[in-house]
């Protein structure tokens, strides 16, 4: 993310959205580059990750984290470079993982940083395949889903960073993996490049029937990222004692009220009861022991080196 000399560009939350965010939701501001005080470091953002959870942080509602306040910098995880340091343990040129959000420069006392060293290889990976999205996939699938060889795993949003990683780990664990994505190009990528056994286009008029045909033995694990009609299509296919890690419900994030159509609440709860389904929502920051992250880094590093996990980034230059 290139900076403007002597200017700190900040994207702030200017208005809470009602439904889809629009041009009034965020505002670009220009301010002075902050000066670090005693015990502080000055950070320059190099990479910013844009993730679905940010939509929820725009709402003034009870959640796992405080909402972004009006006028505050929009939240986000970044890889940043230390430009000045008055903080022990951080030197000029260190790269760090920080939560400083949508801005060119930020100050930190170091307590919220993870030092990646002077010259980390592929620094942007710490926002993706070696960071929060892939760790979400790893922990949710292995700790909640507990996949066993021969089971069928269905992954919503299979072409995204979380879903793509879930499916590849499930294949490593010996499962049949069926992805769900939006469009034939995404589905082709999921099967041809990521190695899923099948991928269904949720935009197809025959989606529910196609999903049923792709899961002849039913569904043992459904990794939920989407909600909505995808969830409703999976429900009748769940086997007894199926597991459903709930990572997100992105199709509902921009709703300002209840979704249109029939009330599926009774069907959802009835299926959970009859089929004895384990449904567990989780937030990656506080749902698992800290030691699990070390296991993730060890395993993912090995899978990347062996080629068992493949990773594709989309990088956009500029704020």
Locate each region found by the language model.
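Glycine-rich beta-strand-centered segment in the early N-terminal region that forms part
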Residues: 32-50, 58-102
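Short amphipathic alpha-helix with an adjacent loop that forms part of the alpha/beta core around
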Residues: 206-216
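Glycine-rich phosphate-binding loop and adjacent beta-alpha segment
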Residues: 229-309
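Short, glycine/polar-rich helix-capping loops at beta-to-alpha or helix-loop-helix junctions
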Residues: 104, 182-190, 207, 264-269
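Short glycine-centered segments of the SAM/dcSAM-binding site in methyltransferase folds
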Residues: 95, 152, 176, 242-243, ...
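NAD(P)H dinucleotide-binding glycine-rich loop of Rossmann-like/cofactor-binding domains
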Residues: 74-84, 89-157, 199, 308-309
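Mid-domain Rossmann-like dinucleotide-binding core that forms the NAD(H)/NADP(H) cofactor-binding site
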Residues: 127-205
């Amino acid at each position: 993310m290139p900076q403007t000399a002597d200017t700190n560009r900040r994207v702030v939350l200017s208005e809470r959205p009602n439904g889809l965010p629009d041009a009034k939701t965020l505002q670009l501001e220009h301010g002075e580059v902050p000066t670090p005080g005693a015990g502080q470091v000055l950070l320059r953002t190099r990479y910013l990750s844009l993730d679905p959870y940010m939509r929820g942080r725009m709402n003034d509602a009870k959640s796992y984290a405080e909402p972004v306040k009006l006028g505050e910098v929009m939240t986000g995880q970044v890889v940043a470079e230390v430009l000045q340091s008055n903080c022990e343990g951080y030197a000029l040129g260190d790269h760090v993982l920080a939560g400083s959000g949508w801005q060119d420069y930020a100050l930190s006392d170091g307590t919220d940083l993870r030092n990646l060293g002077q010259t980390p290889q592929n620094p942007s990976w710490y926002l993706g395949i070696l960071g929060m999205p892939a760790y979400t996939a790893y922990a949710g699938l292995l700790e909640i889903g507990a996949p066993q060889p021969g089971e069928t795993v269905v992954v919503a949003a299979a072409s995204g960073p979380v879903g793509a990683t879930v499916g590849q780990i499930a294949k490593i664990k010996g499962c049949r993996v069926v992805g769900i994505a939006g469009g034939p190009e995404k589905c082709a990528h999921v099967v041809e490049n990521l190695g899923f056994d099948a991928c269904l286009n949720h935009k197809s008029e025959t989606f529910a029937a196609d999903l049923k045909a792709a899961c002849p033995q039913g569904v043992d694990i459904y990794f939920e990222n989407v909600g909505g009609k995808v969830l409703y299509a999976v429900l009748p296919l769940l086997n007894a004692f199926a597991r459903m890690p709930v990572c997100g419900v992105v199709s509902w994030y921009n709703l300002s009220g209840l979704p249109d159509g029939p009330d599926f609440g009774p069907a959802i709860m009835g299926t959970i009861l009859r089929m004895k389904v384990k449904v567990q929502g989780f937030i990656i920051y506080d749902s698992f022991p800290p030691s699990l992250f070390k296991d993730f880094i060890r395993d993912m590093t090995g899978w990347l080196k062996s080629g068992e996990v493949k990773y594709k980034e989309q990088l956009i230059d500029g704020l």
